[in-house]
Each structure stands twice: as C-alpha cells, then as structure tokens.
C-alpha cells in the first residue's frame, strides 16, 4: 500500500535528519525558540468559511504540480484569500522540503501548518524550529500512545495540531483522545482513491456536541 511505503521511507530518512542536526540540538533549538506562533486554530475557528491554501510540488496521485510560478508569487496569491497555508515537507513522494516552509515563513504572517508524515518527536521539534505554527498528525499511521505523545509535545511547544482521519474508527479514536482540531481526508491514504462522500459521513454532530 502507498501509505506503508511512504512511512517506510520516512523511517529510513529519520537517521539522516538526526545526523544533520542531533536530537539534542533540535530539541534545544525548539525549546529556546522565542518565536510567537500565529494561531492555526483561531484562523479556522473564525466566523464563516476558512480557507487553507496548500503549497505542494508533487503527489503520488497527480505527479508534478503546476510549477510555472515562483514560490513568492504563489504565496502572494494565497495571501489575498487564504486564512492559513499548508506546506508539504515530505521529500520522496511529494517533493517537499523544510526549506520551502522556512521561505514561506519569511513571506507571510499567516499561520503555516507543516504537512508531513510525522512519526517521531524530532519532526515536531523541527516544525517549531523551521517556523511552522501547526503540524499534521495522521491517525492512520500512529497508535493512540504515539499519537498522544506527539500531540502533547506539539502543544507544549505552542503548536496547534490538525488530526487527520479517514474513517469512522479513526474519528472515534480522535474523539476519545479529545483532540481540538479534526480534519477529514476524502482520500484513502492506503489506496489514494478519493471519495467525496467521506466527509459527509463523518460530519454529523459528534457525541461531545450534545
């Protein structure tokens, strides 16, 4: 399955990241960071429709994206209507980079979410250091224990967390964990097929809505 391959590749890359900047150093940089985060949660919670514009170079399902305009031009366009920006940092399958997020941080005050396949605390610390205001955690690739560990770490660093689900079981897990922000992905990450009805199935009032 595609998701398994992506996670396997991420596991292979983690030692490379930690060799470049050690876990101890990345942790120190994140904890000592005095950067004030822009609230991703507030950007979504405001009245009316909220738009998250995404910077993505490629994807397994669509190949290379439209790269005819510069990053600066694209972020300028996003700033005209977006409430937040999503930046892909996964290298092998989406051609992302932490460098893109660093550059975007210099171009905008909009909240930025790091979109990646986060499986290790190192990646959360790194998100803080490179300028992200939030991180994506995908329920399908994390058990509850690791999910809670990464979730709590993110909030301790002043980062919001978008918790991604695709089915009823994942939705219930997130409700049980009492997470703050849940995003429903219409794309099945195991097959990469899209079903637009997915979000409709799981957007009825949740038990905690009364």
Feature map (PLM): residue ranges:
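Surface-exposed amphipathic alpha-helices with a cationic face
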Residues: 45, 101-106, 128, 148-155, ...
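Single conserved hydrophobic/aromatic residue that forms the stacking wall/gate
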Residues: 202-210
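Short beta-strand elements of ligand-binding domains
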Residues: 114-116
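Hydrophobic alpha-helical segments that mediate membrane insertion or helix-helix packing
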Residues: 104, 112, 127, 174, ...
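Hydrophobic residues within beta-strands of alpha/beta enzymes
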Residues: 85-86, 112, 135, 182
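Conserved anion-binding
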Residues: 119-193
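Conserved N-terminal beta1-alpha1 strand-loop-helix module at the mouth
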Residues: 1-101, 106-110, 119, 161-162, ...
